[in-house]
Amino acid sequence: MKLIAASLRRLSLAVLTVLLVVSSFAVFTPSASAETYTVKLGSDKGLLVFEPAKLTIKPGDTVEFLNNKVPPHNVVFDAALNPAKSADLAKSLSHKQLLMSPGQSTSTTFPADAPAGEYTFYCEPHRGAGMVGKITVAG
């Protein structure tokens, strides 16, 4: 009887170890489907716009903001205009430091648990001129 109990314990331990190893791969493996998108800050013609002005992504995707024309620019996500209405989320996605030279860039990776919906962002120096964009996180 003791031999059977010892064998069952060893078998249980082996099964638990295998399950732990397999589940750790599922948890810690980065998403293979995560993509990077580029949004230009200023159009190629020098207009004060984001190109593209609207973008649809998935949670876990990265958006690179590339300073193109008519600097300075930055990227600020509106705290009131995101699905969670969260100032903390908006702050974590924003890049308030001004990009002064064409070719400079900054990037934002949307968290894997980012709420689905529309996120509005703008350039602080040029918001009044209509430099506003929207990113939709697909659910």
Swiss-Prot record:
Primary location group: membrane
Topology within the bilayer: Peripheral membrane protein
Any one Gene Ontology cellular component term annotated for this protein: plasma membrane-derived thylakoid membrane
GO molecular function annotations of the record: copper ion binding; electron transfer activity
Cell compartments where the protein resides: Cellular thylakoid membrane
Cofactors: Cu(2+)
Signal peptide per UniProt: 1-34
A UniProt-annotated Pfam family: Copper-bind
Domain (Plastocyanin-like): residue spans on this chain: 35-139
Binding-site list for Cu cation: H73, C123, H126, M131
Key words, A-Z: Copper, Electron transport, Membrane, Metal-binding, Signal, Thylakoid, Transport
Keyword Iron: no
Family (UniProt): Belongs to the plastocyanin family.
Protein purpose: Participates in electron transfer between P700 and the cytochrome b6-f complex in photosystem I.
Protein known as: Plastocyanin
Upper taxonomic lineage: Bacteria, Bacillati, Cyanobacteriota, Cyanophyceae, Nostocales
